[in-house]
């Protein structure tokens, strides 16, 4: 089982981008030293409290300051960029990291970035599929042509090709019910979360992925990664109370975003967002602790993650150590250290 840290490069209101980068890079350095397997980088656009609109660029900076840790995107929002350019830049990162890059991709469940770039969100699913096809063709063919609804290229040659053969590992994020069996049929590793869907629902979604994966005849073991807020402290009371304000801030912010998106969308997407927002609104801190986060002493977190591993067939856990962006730096460091030294060894 692998373990990682999700890094959003968050910046408080009125903060300094340079400080946000420095603080995040310090976290990456500590993760490398403590033996984490992977750093996962977000992609945010038009978001004042995030400074990671270009995760490939940030990944190259991380490659230059680390030697061992895998650098993953979680996720690159493929429909927002020209897929040829993504193929070039991702392959370049694979080179400068000496083959330590993992290509995590998705289409995002939110419309804000699409609106900013002038791309209809209704096109996101088909754009994503075309973009992924273009990128894999670019990596595995000397020259190629492609004709789709949104992207067309004639006899192009993408250089460099990735270091990893045939290409970096591709992991696809899934949140909607219909996406899971599609991903299972394709056979790509899966990235999931518990933020907007109850654990029972995610369990059913992963089961549909597993069924489609097996029916498609894939021989490799399934690979399922869970992103989840994590907080570890030696004292039980501290572990249960210290992250409450920050973690609940994240869920309330997500609730408001889903409500706003639900009001803008039409048809089933609107209903789904509104339903998920209502589900989050009904949850208090005790509810969140039960199935949305992993918090407690090292022993408690081991037990929580063990249950999730069993229910969701997990092969990887990516921890969010500062969900909500209000955890003090010294508490993040303590939580990360305890996670690496006392939680991970029990779950390997």
Give names to the regions the model predicted.
Residues 1-71, 165-168, 338:
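N-terminal beta1-alpha1-beta2 module of alpha/beta enzyme domains
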Residues 2-19, 79-146, 150, 189-191, ...:
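Flexible, glycine-rich active-site loops centered on histidine and acidic residues
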Residues 3, 31, 35, 43, ...:
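Conserved, mostly hydrophobic/aromatic
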Residues 3-7, 39-41, 71-73, 101-105, ...:
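Hydrophobic faces of well-ordered beta-strands that scaffold small-molecule active sites
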Residues 7-21, 76-84, 164-174, 231-233, ...:
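Active-site mouth loops of central-metabolism enzymes
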Residues 32-33, 59-67, 90-101, 181-185, ...:
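Acidic (Asp/Glu)-rich catalytic clusters
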Residues 38-58, 62, 77, 109, ...:
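Glycine-rich, proline-tolerant flexible connector loops at the mouths of alpha/beta enzymes
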Residues 122-158, 200-314:
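An alpha-helical appendage that flanks or caps ligand/catalytic pockets
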């Amino acid at each position: 089982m692998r373990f990682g840290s999700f890094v959003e490069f968050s910046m408080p209101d009125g903060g300094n981008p340079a400080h946000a980068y420095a603080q995040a890079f310090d976290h990456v350095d500590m993760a490398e030293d403590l033996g984490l397997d992977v750093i996962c980088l977000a992609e945010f656009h038009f978001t004042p409290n995030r400074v990671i609109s270009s995760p490939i660029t940030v990944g190259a900076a991380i490659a230059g300051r680390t030697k061992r840790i895998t650098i993953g995107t979680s996720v690159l929002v493929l429909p927002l960029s020209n897929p040829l350019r993504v193929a070039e830049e991702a392959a370049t990162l694979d080179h400068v990291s000496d083959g330590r890059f993992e290509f995590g991709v998705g289409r995002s469940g939110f419309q804000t970035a699409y609106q900013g770039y002038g791309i209809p969100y209704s096109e996101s699913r088909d754009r994503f599929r075309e973009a992924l096809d273009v990128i894999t063709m670019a990596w595995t063919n000397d020259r190629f042509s492609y004709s789709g609804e949104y992207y067309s290229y004639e006899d192009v040659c993408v250089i460099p090709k990735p270091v990893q053969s045939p290409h970096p590992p591709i992991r696809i994020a899934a949140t909607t019910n219909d996406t899971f069996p599609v991903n299972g049929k394709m056979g790509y590793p899966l990235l999931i979360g518990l933020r907007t869907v109850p654990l029972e629902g995610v369990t059913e979604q992963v089961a549909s992925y597993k069924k489609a994966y097996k029916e498609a005849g894939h021989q490799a073991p399934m690979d399922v990664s869970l992103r989840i807020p994590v907080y570890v402290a030696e004292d039980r009371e501290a572990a249960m109370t210290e992250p409450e304000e920050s973690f609940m801030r994240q869920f309330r912010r997500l609730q408001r975003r889903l409500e706003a998106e639900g009001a803008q969308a039409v048809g089933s997407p609107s209903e789904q967002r509104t339903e998920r927002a209502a589900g989050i609104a009904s949850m208090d801190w005790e509810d969140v602790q039960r199935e949305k986060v992993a918090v407690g002493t090292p022993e408690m977190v081991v037990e929580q993650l063990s249950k999730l591993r069993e229910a969701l067939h997990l092969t990887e856990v990516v921890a969010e150590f500062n969900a909500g962006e209000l955890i003090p730096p010294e508490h993040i460091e303590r939580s990360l250290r305890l996670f690496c030294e006392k939680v991970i060894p029990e779950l390997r």
